[in-house]
């Protein structure tokens, strides 16, 4: 794979993983800390997309979203990155853009670095979300990259509390 293919594949995986996490969280609306992390993944991705597209962001970096708003933003972010990268020429990954962060500081960063950051940042927070799910006896989402590539879930260690509860039923 060339660099553009890696970026596109990483962002496609992110969209897929966000869908998997949404499904796991939808069944656990009481996990407010996990929802806060999930909404941040979406909010940060939208903020970065807005910077890349040189427009104001429609949400904050740490938005407070309803279930419906989170689902709509998840879809908008996935579609937005697909659209953005489909129009991007391979050489544009090294183009540098200027933007202002949420603290008001100005930075200059290559488009490829921003796109890679979006994918990696999401993975970091998805791991935290899965840990929060597991700590609350909820089934984590199998959102590993290899599961995305294979099209089947990676091996998942059962949540002991769930395993015992099902055995008692």
Model feature map: region roles:
Residues 4, 8-63, 102-165, 169:
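Short, contiguous alpha-helical
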Residues 57-100:
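Helix-adjacent hinge/juxtasegments
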């Amino acid at each position: 794979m060339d660099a553009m293919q890696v970026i596109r594949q990483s962002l496609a995986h992110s969209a897929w993983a966000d869908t998997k996490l949404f499904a796991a969280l939808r069944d656990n609306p009481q996990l407010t800390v996990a929802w806060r992390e999930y909404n941040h993944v979406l909010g940060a991705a939208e903020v970065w997309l807005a910077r890349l597209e040189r427009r104001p962001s429609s949400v904050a970096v740490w938005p407070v979203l309803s279930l419906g708003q989170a689902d709509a933003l998840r879809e908008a972010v996935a579609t937005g990155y697909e659209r953005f990268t489909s129009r991007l020429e391979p050489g544009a990954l090294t183009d540098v853009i200027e933007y202002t962060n949420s603290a008001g500081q100005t930075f200059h960063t290559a488009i490829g670095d921003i796109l890679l950051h979006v994918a990696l940042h999401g993975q970091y927070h998805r791991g935290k979300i899965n840990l929060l799910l597991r700590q609350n006896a909820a089934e984590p989402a199998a959102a590993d990259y290899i599961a995305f590539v294979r099209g089947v879930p990676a091996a998942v260690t059962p949540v002991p509390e769930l395993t015992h509860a099902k055995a008692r039923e």
